[in-house]
Amino acid sequence: LSIGSLYQFFPDKRAIIWALAERYTAESQACISAALAGVGDAEGLGQAFSELVDIYYRLFLAEPVMRDIWSGTQADKALRQLELADSRANAEFLTAVLRRLRPTADPTALETTAFLVWQMGEAAMRLAISVERQEGDRLVAAYKRMALRELLAE
């Protein structure tokens, strides 16, 4: 399918990026929800979170279109809002796990931590795919260590 033929179905580039972003958002939320749904202890969170980060990184490395979608969302205010809403939704899955693990913790603090960890993860992935592969791998490993230290803190 050529780019020109896409414009038969979409009025402009923004509409194409929006449709791709919505599709990716739905698929990623289903994956994240499934991965975190059964987590009941710190070890399970560590494993599930690490696997999700690795999947996300591999996806960005394997699918250049993901980079294009991200670039397109950054260039458009409405698309940035879509991405922000997606990030909040994904952070809610993480918050649910944190609440199960720390039922007496301040819920607002857990929400803030989950949202910030999620946003930092997205930034870490973008940085990792912008540098040489070996450095990107190190950055992703460092992010996982830092994020898990915060998520698993008592």
Residue ranges: model-predicted function:
Residues A37-A42, A62-D68, T73-K77, R88-A114, ...:
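Hydrophobic alpha-helical bundle segments that form small-molecule/ligand-binding pockets
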Residues A15, A19, R23, S33-L61, ...:
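Hydrophobic alpha-helical connector segments
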Residues L82, R88, E92, A96, ...:
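Non-catalytic cap/lid and distal C-terminal segments of serine-dependent acyl enzymes
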Residues L1-A15:
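Helix-turn-helix
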Residues S71-G72, R80, R100-M146:
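Hydrophobic/aromatic-rich alpha-helical bundle segments in the mid-to-C-terminal region
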